[in-house]
Amino acid sequence: MKKHYPTFPFFLTLVLVGLIAACSPKIQQAPESKFNRVQNIPPDIEKWERDMLAFERQDKEKNPGKRPILFIGSSSIVGWKSLESDFPGKRLLNRGFGGSQTDEVHYYAFRILYPYKPKQVVIYVGDNDIAAGKSSETVYNDLKDLFDDIRYQLPKTKITYISIKPSPSRWHLMDEFTKTNERVKTYLESMGNASYVDVVKPMLMPNGKANPEYFLSDSLHMTPQGYSVWAEALRPHLKGRF
């Protein structure tokens, strides 16, 4: 029987494929998700079920569309009523729920985050964690777990974190806020396709104190002027042009 040997073009093709593979940029492997929803159930998590059901009703009433820029987190996200006017022309979706902490946001990510497959997720959470007595170390680790899980579940989604704000009513916690912010900033810079938005500096007066014009009478939640500061700080970090 006559043997058929590979032709020269065949070998040339193999060589070219090898060269292309060697020269192609390496994509960093996403860390495997270590979050176990069964073993990591936050206390009183059922109190948020009403919010989750409300989000599901909203999705049925109005299709959120494909790959939105998703905002998740605590009451500072919930209260951002000017979101669409601050970022016109963007497909935005707000899925914040007030009073939430990082582990609660992470627990509900399978309902408020992953189903939407956002092109970008903007996160504000951690404030309530520290106010509840958690250390900056604990909050940082919870945030890191959340970031890693997002990267594992949605490797192409940009992760953007808004720093913990300098609320006058929680000024005594600023050292812990600062420690958390600094560690989160460093971690996000190492991730790629992620960004950290500093809202502390623009919310301070020249004397280093929080500007009261940016906060409501409770000295915790923000005024429209406060949200304008946030919008200005966030705008350069959003995907797509304005």
Which residues does each PLM region occupy?
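Acidic/histidine-rich helix-loop elements
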Residues: Q39-D44, L92-E104, A131, S219
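Extracellular glycan-modifying ectodomains
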Residues: K62-P64, R111, N128, K144, ...
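Oxyanion-hole/transition-state-stabilizing segment in secreted/luminal serine hydrolases
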Residues: I77-R91, D103-N141, T160, I164-P168
